[in-house]
């Protein structure tokens, strides 16, 4: 984990390595820092918020916006996250939206661009991880980059380029049935190669244990052969620390949020940022509380069942929905009297069989758009009805709800656990949000998080 003896040792080794070769880059003194050292482009809001929360927990001030145009208006944070809903949209649209974010961050002078995507590398052959990375290579001027989706603490690991969920290849896991991005090929070298003209190679696990010098030599040899993209084997937390030490000076890096936890120690060791931690806090937020769930992940279904033991839950059947407006009106009529007695849950989440039936009727994208449209419009109506605390399950759902609510900038709290980000809007009548990855979080997360929002110490 970030701050561990292993990561500190690697950071020190990294510093000694460069000083001994007179490669240290002159840095600005702390008091005159005006350029961010780390610019993150996240392909969904849950992951973007998680990344920001990890940096904040490490004492790194981090701005968080959903509109690239707002990057210029931020103060002088050393890190900025631009989170957009691009994970499952067509590649050309994802590239266009990412270009706006990248240009905004580079215009601020970002020292490194980090493209954040999911630990399960959610992407089909028509996916956009490859095209977006191609764009970022061009804009950043990077000659090569690596791909590190792994999250060892959650048993999302990569070995010989193959992605595992626990002991299962991802193609043998429930992710093979994902309604939007079914993962049927576990070989990430193959998956990525089908999305890009850049040659894809592998940083095999034995190299990670050999040290930085052998890693750099291997990369130099492979790039001489034309390789530009490297899938990084990652099994242990120490592998993430090694990869962070290797890539902290790269113009472009890509991966899951977990590797980001290891950068702050390196930045501090190099004098890029002050060693003193900031002490962020989020205010308590009152008002009614609601769970809005759109994810069909097994973990979200378990969390809904747990929440329902003590709180009412409405499940919206997409096959019976007579359009967005009708479904929203019916859900609002159901929720209003119940909110007087405590939090409620409203979900479009369904079993895989039910999802398949909805997709047969509406198409894959049509079913997703219907569900997101219902929950997004419902969030607006619920806010008008006095709801100020929202727990949202699902990355695509989170993006839709934040967009419908017109939220463009958030004050993010420190990291609260894998896949979980908590934030408040910066306004006189704030809204508290927990944007949760569909696949992650403890079973009792919904009720405990809504309760914690009532107390500032609960979301600090």
Regions found by a protein language model. Name each.
Residues 3-5, 10, 24-28:
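Short, low-complexity intrinsically disordered segments enriched in A/P/G/S/L with frequent Arg
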Residues 34-37, 78, 94, 102-240, ...:
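Cap/lid and interdomain-hinge subdomains that line or gate substrate/regulatory clefts
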Residues 50-53, 125-129, 156-164, 214-215, ...:
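Short acidic, glycine/serine/threonine-rich loops at helix termini
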Residues 335, 339-393:
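C-terminal structural cap/anchor segments
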């Amino acid at each position: 984990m970030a701050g561990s003896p292993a990561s500190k040792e690697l950071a020190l080794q990294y510093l000694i390595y460069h000083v001994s070769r007179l490669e240290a880059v002159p840095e600005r003194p702390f008091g005159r820092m005006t350029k961010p050292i780390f610019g993150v482009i996240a392909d969904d809001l849950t992951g973007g918020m998680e990344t920001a929360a990890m940096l904040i927990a490490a004492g790194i001030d981090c701005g968080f916006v959903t509109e690239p145009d707002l990057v210029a208006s931020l103060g002088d944070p050393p890190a900025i996250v631009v989170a957009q809903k691009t994970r499952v949209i067509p590649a050309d649209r994802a590239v266009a939206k990412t270009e706006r974010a990248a240009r905004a961050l580079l215009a601020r002078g970002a020292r490194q661009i980090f493209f954040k995507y999911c630990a399960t590398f959610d992407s089909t052959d028509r996916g956009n991880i490859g095209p977006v990375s191609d764009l970022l290579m061009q804009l950043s001027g990077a000659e090569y980059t690596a791909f590190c989706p792994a999250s060892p603490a959650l048993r999302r690991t990569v070995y010989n380029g193959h992605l595992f969920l626990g002991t299962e290849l991802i193609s043998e896991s429930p992710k093979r049935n994902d309604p939007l991005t079914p993962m049927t090929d576990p070989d990430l070298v193959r998956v990525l190669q089908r999305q890009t003209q850049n040659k894809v190679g592998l940083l095999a696990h034995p190299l990670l244990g050999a040290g930085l010098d052998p890693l750099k030599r291997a990369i130099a040899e492979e790039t001489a052969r034309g390789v530009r993209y490297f899938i990084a084997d990652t099994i242990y937390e120490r592998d993430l620390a090694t990869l962070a030490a290797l890539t902290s000076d790269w113009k472009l890096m890509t991966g899951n949020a977990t590797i980001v936890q290891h950068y702050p120690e390196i930045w501090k060791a190099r004098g890029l940022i002050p060693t003193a931690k900031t002490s962020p806090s989020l205010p308590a937020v009152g008002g009614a509380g609601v769970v809005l769930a759109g994810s069909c992940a097994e973990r979200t279904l378990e969390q809904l069942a747990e929440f329902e033991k003590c709180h009412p839950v409405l499940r919206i059947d997409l096959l019976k929905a007579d359009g967005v407006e009708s479904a929203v009106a019916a859900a609002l009529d159901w929720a209003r009297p119940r909110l007087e007695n405590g939090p409620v849950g409203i979900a479009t989440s369904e079993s895989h069989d039910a999802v398949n039936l909805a997709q047969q009727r509406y198409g894959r994208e049509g079913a997703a758009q219907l569900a997101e449209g219902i929950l997004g419009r419902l969030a607006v109506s619920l806010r008008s009805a006095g709801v100020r605390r929202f727990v949202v399950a699902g990355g695509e759902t989170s993006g839709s709800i934040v967009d419908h609510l017109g939220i463009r900038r958030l004050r993010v709290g420190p990291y609260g656990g894998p896949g979980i980000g908590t934030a408040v809007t910066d306004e006189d009548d704030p809204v508290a949000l927990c944007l949760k990855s569909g696949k992650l979080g403890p079973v009792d997360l919904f009720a405990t998080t809504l309760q914690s929002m009532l107390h500032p110490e609960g979301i600090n």
